[in-house]
Structure formats: structure tokens, C-alpha cells
């Protein structure tokens, strides 16, 4: 809006110009004005018209600001649309990332559960192998003179080593797959953070609810337009004042010649008065001047003199108005630059998003590879677990069989001891019968020996038939009769075997 002084000057000049063409009969008579004063006012009015360049510049500023505003509105709309799209894509990427993370978490839980199962199986296998290592074979079951050996000596321990090595390799593969996939997830996270960072780095866009600047650009453009209109009106008033000065000078005797001479002395100017001062006597102004009454001329001179006092103020208003418009134009350009910067930063975020989306396929492929590798290695580990379970069952059966062997040996030895005891009792009974038989024979011999001839006594003096019980080895490679009893097991061997059997 124009300043109050500018408005007053413009209004005063317009009112004076209107009064100059009025022929009101109530106007007071005014004294004549020296021609020199009129010429000075004419030259001052001519110089004031140089403000036309300022008005044109103001118009250019307004036109440019309006164009910049229109471009900024379009660019801001595009930027807002692009930002909304990027934000939606980021949301989609985060959903995909959460899905990939769930796959990783499931694989991680499966891996931890698998490790627990492996630990349990390994602990059971180790416990069983320790039993075999700690169980020394009793010498009764081995050749004489052989050094003591544990049960583990008689089985292939390499199976366990190979199984353990295979399990370690599978676990290492699972760990490598997990590490590789974790690296892919980390890179995906970095990509998403990079897009967010680029988007957040973009300056905010002005909006009615969130004004980045103190004055919206549209308000600045409206103010520039109002200023431009006010300056144009001031220039129009200066132009009418100039025309009125020309008329007053031409209406004064000798005024035209003096004006031309003074204009020449005033130096070169973009505005020439020669064309409007000379006239050719045929135009309407010349006719008006010729028919102008003294009263009308005096009224015209009064208006010229009154307006002349306000020319300087109007020119200053035009200059100050242009300065204010230049400042406003700078603010418009500043906001436009802000919008352009926001758009460029948003484009950077969009380009970064395109790069991330180009790599999205590799992240999804990494998930598939991770799942496949885990399945392969888990199948291999479950197979090894089955083998480990078979080894545990075999080793436990082996240890149990040895304990059964010890108990069986002890049972057989006990049976032999019982048989031996029975045979001892039988031998004692036989010996007693033999003693009784010997006594009976002596008694009979004494009773009938003197009466029976020797021919009838044939064989009666033979000793009673003897019986002998011996142990016989009927096994493979046996040598027939053996003496003595079975070898006893080492002290504590049987008790230890019984404890292990009862503990299973």
C-alpha cells in the first residue's frame, strides 16, 4: 500500500488537476505568476517524470514476483506430493524390513533351540563315553599279562570325532549364514536411515498451518501489487501536473521560448519538452489556450503553484516505494529459493530412495538364501543328532552289556560254588558209606571166613569201587578235566556293575 504522504500527494495533485479544468465562477482571483517561476516548475515537473523508470522497475518487480510465486506454488505442490510418496515408500520399506527381521528372529530362535538340543545330546554322549573310559575291563575277561584297558578301547572313538567335526562345521555354516544375513539387514537399515536423513534434511514447506516465514509469499505479492498500483497513480498525477505546467507556460507570453532555453541549459534528459512547448497552433490545446479566460488562467496558475509544492514529496514516495518493493521482492526471492532448496533436497531423497529400491531385490534374495542355508544345515544337524543318538544308544548298550557280562560271570561262578559244595557233601557221604562198608566187610569176614572155602570167596576180598568227581571244560578248545574253581572278579567290580544296572 502506498504511504499516507504518497496518498495525500497523489490525491492533492489529482484534485488540483481537476480544479484546473473547472470553470467554477466562485474561484477567487489569483495574482499573476512570473514566467520564470512557471518555467522552473515545468522543469521540475519534467525531472519528476524520470520516476517513470522507477515505476517501470516496480512493475517489473511485481510481474517477476507474481511469476516466481506461481512457480513456487507449483514447485511446492510437486515437492509435497513427492515427499508424501517418499514417506509412503519409507513406510513400505520399513514393513519389508520388519518382515526380514522376523525371519532373522525365527532363524535365531531355531538356532538357539538347536544348540540347546546339541548341548543336551553332547552332554549325554560325553557322559556315556566317560562311563566307558572309566570302566576298566576286569582281567578275568582278558589274556593274562595284558595291561588294563577301558571299555572305550574296544570301540572306534573316531566315529565320535568325525561326528563332532561334522556338527561343528554345520554350526559354523549356520553362524556364517546368520552373520551374512545380519549384515544384509544392517545395510538395509542404513539405506532406510539414509533416505530418512535426506528427507529430514529438506527444509520445510510454507503452509497456512506451518509458516516457515513471518509473511506468506502470497501476501508479499499482494503488497507488491498494491505498491505498484500506488506508484503508477503517483506517476499519473505527476504526468497531469507536467501537462498542466506545459499549458501554463504556453499560455504565458514568452513562456515557450524561455522554457526551451532553460531546458537546454538544464542538460540532456530522457524527456524532451520541445514537442509539447512549441505546438503548431492547430491542436485542441492551442485552441483551449486561445479561448482561455483570465479567470481560468488564474485558476490554472493557482493549481500549478499548489501542486508544485507536492512534486518533491510524490517523487520521494515513489523512490521509497521502490525501495520497499525491492526489499519485499528480496523476501519473495528468498522464499522461492527456500522452496527450490526444499525441492532439490527432496529430489536427493527420491534419488536415494531409487538406489535403495534397486537393492531391495538383493535383500529379499538374501532372506531366501538365509532360509535355504538354514534348512540345509538344520537337516544336516538333525541327521547328525540321530547319529549321535544311535551312538549313545550303542555305547549305553555296550556299557550295559559289559555290566551284564560281569553279573553273568558272577552268577555262573556262584553256581559252580554251589555245585562244588554239593559235591563236597556227596563226597563226605560217600566216604562215610565206604567206612561203614569196610567195617561190615571185616565183620562178615570174621563171622564166616573160617567156614567158607576160598573157592566160594572169589572177589569178596576186592576193595569197594571208588568214585571220583572232576570239573570238565566242554567249551571250544577245552582240554577235558580241570581242577579248582573259577577265577574270582576283582573286588568291587560286581558291586559297581550292579549299581550301574540299577541306575539305568
From Swiss-Prot:
Entry GO CC: Atg1/ULK1 kinase complex; phagophore assembly site membrane
Topology relative to the membrane: Peripheral membrane protein
Localization per Swiss-Prot or TrEMBL: Cytoplasm; Preautophagosomal structure membrane
Primary localization class, coarse: cytoplasm
GO molecular function per UniProt: molecular adaptor activity; protein kinase activator activity
Pfam families to which the protein is assigned, alphabetical: ATG17_like
GO biological process, one term: autophagosome assembly
InterPro entries: Atg17, ATG17-like_dom
Superkingdom as given in the UniProt entry: Eukaryota
UniProtKB keywords: Autophagy, Cytoplasm, Membrane
Family of this protein: Belongs to the ATG17 family.
General function of this protein: Autophagy-specific protein that functions in response to autophagy-inducing signals as a scaffold to recruit other ATG proteins to organize pre-autophagosomal structure (PAS) formation. Modulates the timing and magnitude of the autophagy response, such as the size of the sequestering vesicles. Plays particularly a role in pexophagy and nucleophagy.
PANTHER family on file: AUTOPHAGY-RELATED PROTEIN 17
Name this polypeptide is given: Autophagy-related protein 17
UniProt source species: Pyricularia oryzae (strain 70-15 / ATCC MYA-4617 / FGSC 8958)
Name of the gene this protein is made from: ATG17
Amino acid at each position: 500500500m502506498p504511504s499516507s504522504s504518497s496518498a495525500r500527494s497523489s490525491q492533492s495533485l489529482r484534485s488540483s488537476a481537476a480544479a484546473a479544468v473547472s470553470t467554477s465562477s466562485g474561484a477567487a482571483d489569483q495574482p499573476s505568476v512570473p514566467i520564470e517561476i512557471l518555467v522552473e516548475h515545468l522543469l521540475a515537473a519534467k525531472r519528476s517524470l524520470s520516476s517513470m523508470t522507477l515505476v517501470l522497475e516496480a512493475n517489473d518487480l511485481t510481474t517477476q514476483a507474481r511469476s516466481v510465486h506461481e512457480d513456487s506454488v507449483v514447485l511446492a505442490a510437486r515437492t509435497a506430493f513427492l515427499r508424501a510418496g517418499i514417506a509412503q515408500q519409507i513406510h513400505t520399506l520399513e514393513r519389508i524390513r520388519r518382515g526380514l527381521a522376523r525371519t532373522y528372529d525365527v532363524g535365531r530362535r531355531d538356532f538357539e533351540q538347536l544348540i540347546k538340543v546339541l548341548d543336551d545330546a553332547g552332554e549325554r554322549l560325553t557322559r556315556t563315553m566317560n562311563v566307558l573310559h572309566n570302566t576298566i575291563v576286569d582281567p578275568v575277561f582278558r589274556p593274562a599279562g595284558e595291561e588294563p584297558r577301558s571299555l572305550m578301547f574296544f570301540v572306534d572313538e573316531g566315529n565320535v570325532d568325525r561326528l563332532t567335526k561334522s556338527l561343528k562345521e554345520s554350526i559354523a555354516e549356520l553362524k556364517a549364514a546368520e552373520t551374512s544375513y545380519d549384515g544384509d539387514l544392517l545395510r538395509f537399515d542404513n539405506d532406510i536411515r539414509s533416505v530418512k536423513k535426506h528427507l529430514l534434511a529438506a527444509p520445510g514447506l510454507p503452509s497456512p498451518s506451518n509458516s516457515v516465514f513471518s509473511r506468506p509469499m502470497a501476501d508479499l505479492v499482494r503488497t507488491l501489487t498494491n505498491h505498484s498500483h500506488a506508484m503508477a497513480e503517483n506517476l499519473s498525477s505527476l504526468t497531469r501536473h507536467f501537462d498542466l505546467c506545459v499549458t501554463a507556460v504556453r499560455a504565458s507570453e514568452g513562456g515557450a521560448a524561455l522554457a526551451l532555453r532553460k531546458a537546454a541549459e538544464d542538460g540532456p534528459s530522457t524527456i524532451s519538452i520541445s514537442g509539447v512547448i512549441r505546438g503548431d497552433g492547430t491542436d485542441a490545446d492551442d485552441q483551449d489556450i486561445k479561448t482561455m479566460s483570465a479567470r481560468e488562467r488564474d485558476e490554472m496558475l493557482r493549481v500549478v503553484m499548489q501542486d508544485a509544492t507536492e512534486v518533491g514529496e510524490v517523487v520521494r514516495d515513489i523512490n521509497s516505494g521502490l525501495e520497499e518493493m525491492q526489499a519485499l521482492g528480496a523476501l519473495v526471492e528468498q522464499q522461492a529459493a527456500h522452496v527450490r532448496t526444499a525441492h532439490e533436497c527432496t529430489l536427493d531423497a527420491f534419488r536415494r530412495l531409487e538406489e535403495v529400491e534397486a537393492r531391495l531385490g538383493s535383500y529379499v534374495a538374501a532372506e531366501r538364501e538365509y532360509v535355504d542355508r538354514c534348512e540345509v544345515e538344520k537337516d544336516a544337524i538333525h541327521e547328525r543328532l540321530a547319529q549321535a543318538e544311535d551312538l549313545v544308544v550303542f555305547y549305553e548298550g555296550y556299557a550295559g552289556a559289559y555290566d551284564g557280562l560281569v553279573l553273568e560271570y558272577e552268577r555262573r561262578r556262584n553256581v559252580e560254588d554251589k555245585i562244588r559244595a554239593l559235591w563236597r557233601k556227596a563226597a563226605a557221604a560217600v566216604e562215610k558209606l565206604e567206612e561203614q562198608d569196610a567195617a561190615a566187610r571185616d565183620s562178615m569176614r570174621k563171622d564166616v571166613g573160617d567156614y567158607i572155602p576160598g573157592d566160594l570167596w572169589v572177589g569178596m576180598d576186592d576193595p569197594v569201587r571208588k568214585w571220583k568227581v572232576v570239573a570238565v571244560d566242554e567249551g571250544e578248545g577245552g582240554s577235558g578235566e580241570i581242577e579248582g574253581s573259577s577265577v574270582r572278579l576283582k573286588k568291587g567290580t560286581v558291586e559297581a556293575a550292579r549299581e550301574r544296572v540299577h541306575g539305568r
